[in-house]
């Protein structure tokens, strides 16, 4: 350095400035006609920006000495690099008709510089004092952001003794005054007044960055670091983003050490005359002396650029932009669009995309299809009153242990750019929604984001959902339907966005799912939570030799060959691009699809009101909205801009397989049907007890097997059908019994034939049968159900056998239609 006009000139920094200016003038990409950063100036003009983004890879290709100087001593050369950018901008504006970036009205306007694409990413734990002043890049998760406040960059001070003005006093990470007045006759060192109108301020924001989960060593807690954002990069990082910050490490005074109780390490010169009469040293007077004598410093990261880790922001699937900026909208290149169209034209592409979801898990196609539709989502809408209509799809997976529920959640959290994985057992209401914390420096209360806020515009995966406390489950009611979080705490009243899809996993209450009971008895979840899920899937671990063989073969093959064992049709990168492109579409409902939607909803409501129907929860308008969202997601998966009736039918099928047939286990009635179609029963036996022939073991042989095959056909009905018929018959018998008791005369029971005729007439009045064959088949099923209710379940009892008139041979035969039935007094309807 040499003295020049009373000031020292940094010759090395001046040379770096000139070389960097030459780089901006001359650097060209291969086969490019004009300089690369001349086109960058055009982009700066279009977005009215004062920040020039420089690719550090270009600097490395241009001059190795320049890149080494910038990397090693960035903090020293940073003002000179900004000055080079300003000179480059001033050169390019001459002789042009375009609006200049720096106008004549504001010649002191600064041009900021932002580097990106640094080759080596540092881990947060590697940032120490050795990195102070160097240009580095670090990746982490943003956990907290402060409000944007003004920061003093260069101050203009007025001497209170002589009135002299000192300009351009650079601030050194704290309030910095001139050391001494420049007036030779004035020796003022402490009496200064800041002239705010002539000082230079900029936007300032502090962001808390935390290590990513992959970088945390075993047995260690995640570390955090404060990141300082300035100028135009404020509000670029949001809580929950995984971000790459480029900048330098700086040592800043620790304000918390000043305010905390106890002794502080302080550097001072021994001066007896500065002690007062009691021998006690003077205290720190305000923040002016902060950092002057205190030895309490901490590391902070001063960033010059912010880059989302996955290279691009997620698609905004709402009508408005994420931050109200058109530049944030997803843009696809022609190559990416061609690749998406190629995937769409692959034969049977939908099933291949479903198979590409979580390929490490064998089978479970319905759940994979639900996860794909959840990743795509429906179309978000806003009413004229400003009410948001949810477009995100919520999915709940209930299943036995070791059914790969957590693997589905982990995979989904990894494929989405903005996602949060948490466990319900260890999550509180504040941890899921938001909490109010105290700002360490200002002492004011601020809102710290919870899991649902961090997953805004993404997916929140909650494992062990049933293990959450009731008060914690209530906290997410609003977030699941209105997609907002309302907070009224510590003087803060705010409504925060939680526009996220929820993928939850829960275990049955008894450890295993009991198919004989409805879903509400198997899962410890209230109906208010269950109704907010669009799809609820049950995973039951049943022994099946064929399925078990294929699962074992798949798992062993994955352990043996790792990635080679998995050969999905589309890779994860292709799947991400396809989903991102499909989410940018906003399909509209066609008139034909509207008709199918209305008819399907009416049919579902009619089935819900049928006695004995066993569904996961009641059919409400929420399920109609779920059908709309699923139809739009299916249309997106096919890259259609219009929702077709076929999409609606597929959505109805998904809804039926998830919540209506959730307990659709089969009931085998083959042992309870009569060989002669159930018209006669042997006279020597009590109808309420099994016959001796039934009790005696049958001899094995081809004759007996043939007789069994010809005498009885296999009769299997669904559990829902069985329960519906059972409850209808029991209710009719109870009504008859009450009427007889009230009148005081008549028989308490009903004839079986009259009971069957009543049920068939009731169903026929509702249009349940279309032919005589269906009626005969239904009568056969009802007879078998009655036999089971008498012989096995004991829900019905036989009061009288009801002997029929003598036949031609003079023998009296008992018929099942003529016997009198009643409800067992100990039976209680569920």
Swiss-Prot record:
- Entry function: Probable component of the MCM2-7 complex (MCM complex) that may function as a DNA helicase and which is essential to undergo a single round of replication initiation and elongation per cell cycle in eukaryotic cells.
Q: Which residues cross the membrane?
A: none
What molecular functions are annotated in GO for this chain?
Answer: ATP binding; ATP hydrolysis activity; single-stranded 3'-5' DNA helicase activity; single-stranded DNA binding; zinc ion binding
Name assigned to this protein: DNA replication licensing factor MCM6
Its GO biological process terms? Answer: DNA replication initiation; double-strand break repair via break-induced replication; mitotic DNA replication
Q: What species was this sequence derived from?
A: Oryza sativa subsp. indica
UniProt entry tagged with the keyword Nucleus: yes
Q: From the Swiss-Prot or TrEMBL record, state where the protein is found.
A: Nucleus
| GO cellular component term of the entry, any | MCM complex
- ZnF (C4-type) spans are 159-186
Family per record: Belongs to the MCM family.
CDD domains named in the record: MCM6
Q: Give the reaction(s) catalysed.
A: ATP + H2O = ADP + phosphate + H(+)
* Matching SMART domains: MCM (SM00350)
């Amino acid at each position: 350095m040499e003295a020049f006009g009373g000031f020292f000139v940094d010759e090395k920094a001046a040379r770096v400035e000139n070389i960097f200016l030459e780089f901006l003038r001359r650097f060209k990409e291969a086969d490019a006609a004009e300089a690369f950063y001349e086109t960058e100036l055009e982009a700066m003009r279009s977005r009215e920006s004062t920040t020039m983004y420089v690719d550090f890879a270009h600097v490395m290709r241009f001059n190795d000495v320049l890149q080494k100087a910038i990397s090693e001593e960035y903090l020293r050369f940073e003002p000179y690099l900004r000055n080079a950018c300003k000179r480059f901008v001033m050169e390019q504006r001459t002789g042009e008709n375009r609006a200049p970036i720096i106008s004549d009205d504001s010649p002191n306007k600064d041009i900021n510089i932002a580097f990106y694409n640094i080759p080596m990413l540092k881990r947060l734990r590697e940032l120490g004092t050795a990195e102070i002043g160097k240009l580095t890049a670090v990746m982490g998760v943003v956990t907290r952001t402060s409000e944007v406040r003004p920061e003093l960059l260069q101050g203009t001070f007025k001497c209170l003794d002589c009135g002299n003005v000192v300009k351009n006093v650079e601030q050194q990470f704290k309030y910095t005054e001139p050391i001494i007045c420049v007036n030779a006759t004035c020796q003022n060192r402490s009496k200064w007044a800041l002239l705010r109108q002539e000082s230079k301020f900029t936007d300032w924001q502090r962001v808390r960055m935390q290590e990513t989960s992959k970088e945390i060593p075993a047995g260690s807690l995640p570390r955090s670091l404060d990141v300082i954002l300035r100028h135009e990069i404020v509000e670029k990082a949001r809580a929950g983003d995984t971000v790459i910050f480029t900048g330098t490490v700086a040592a800043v005074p620790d304000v918390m050490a000043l305010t905390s109780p106890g002794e502080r390490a302080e550097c001072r010169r021994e001066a007896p005359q500065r002690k007062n009469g009691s021998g006690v040293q003077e205290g720190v007077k305000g923040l002016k002396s902060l950092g002057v004598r205190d030895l309490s410093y901490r590391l902070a990261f001063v960033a010059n650029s912010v880059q989302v880790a996955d290279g691009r922001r997620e698609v905004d699937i709402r009508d408005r932009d994420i931050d109200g900026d058109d530049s944030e909208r997803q843009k696809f290149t022609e190559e990416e669009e061609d690749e998406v169209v190629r995937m769409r034209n692959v034969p049977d592409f939908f099933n291949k995309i479903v198979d590409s979801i979580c390929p490490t898990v064998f089978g479970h196609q319905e759940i994979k299809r639900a996860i794909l539709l959840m990743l795509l989502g429906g179309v978000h809408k806003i009413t004229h009153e400003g009410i948001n209509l949810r477009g995100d799809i919520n999915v709940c997976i209930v299943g036995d242990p070791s059914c790969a529920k957590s693997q589905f959640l982990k995979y989904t959290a990894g494929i989405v750019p903005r996602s949060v994985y948490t466990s319900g057992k260890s999550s509180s209401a504040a941890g899921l929604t938001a909490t109010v914390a105290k700002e360490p420096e200002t002492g004011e209360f601020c809102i710290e984001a919870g899991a649902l806020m961090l997953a805004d515009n993404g997916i929140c995966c909650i494992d062990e959902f049933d293990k959450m406390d009731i008060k914690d489950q209530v906290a997410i009611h609003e977030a699941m339907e209105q997609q907002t979080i309302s907070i009224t705490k510590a003087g803060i009243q705010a409504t925060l966005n939680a526009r996220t899809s929820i993928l939850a996993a829960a275990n049955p209450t008894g450890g295993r799912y009991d198919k004989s009971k409805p879903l509400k008895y198997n899962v410890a979840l209230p109906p208010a939570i269950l109704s907010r899920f669009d799809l609820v899937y049950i995973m039951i671990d049943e022994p099946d030799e064929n399925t078990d063989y294929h699962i074992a073969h798949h798992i062993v093959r994955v352990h043996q060959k790792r990635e080679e064992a998995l050969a999905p049709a589309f890779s994860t990168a292709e799947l991400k691009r396809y989903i991102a492109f499909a989410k940018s579409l906003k399909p509209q409902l066609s008139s034909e699809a509207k008709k199918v939607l209305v008819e399907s909803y009416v049919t579902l409501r009619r089935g819900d009101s049928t006695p004995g129907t066993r569904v996961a929860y009641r059919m409400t308008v929420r399920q109609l909205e779920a059908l709309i969202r699923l139809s739009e997601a299916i249309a997106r998966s096919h890259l259609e801009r219009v929702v077709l009736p076929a999409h609606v039918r597929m959505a109805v099928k998904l809804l039926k397989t998830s919540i209506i047939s959730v307990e659709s286990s089969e009931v085998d009635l083959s042992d309870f049907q009569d060989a002669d179609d159930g018209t006669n029963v042997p006279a020597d036996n009590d109808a309420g007890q099994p016959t001796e022939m039934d009790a005696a073991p049958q001899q094995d042989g081809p004759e007996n097997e043939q007789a069994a095959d010809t005498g009885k056909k296999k009769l299997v009905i669904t559990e829902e059908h069985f329960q519906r018929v059972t409850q209808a018959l029991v209710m009719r018998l109870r009504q008859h019994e009450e009427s007889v008791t009230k009148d005081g005369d008549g028989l308490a029971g009903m004839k079986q034939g009259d009971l069957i005729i009543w049920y068939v007439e009731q169903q026929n009045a509702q249009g349940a049968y279309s032919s005589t064959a269906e009626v005969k088949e239904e009568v056969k099923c009802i007879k078998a159900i009655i036999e089971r209710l008498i012989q096995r379940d004991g829900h019905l009892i036989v009061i009288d056998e009801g002997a029929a008139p003598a036949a031609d041979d003079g023998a009296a035969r008992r018929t099942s239609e003529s016997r009198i039935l009643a409800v067992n007094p100990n039976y209680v309807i569920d």
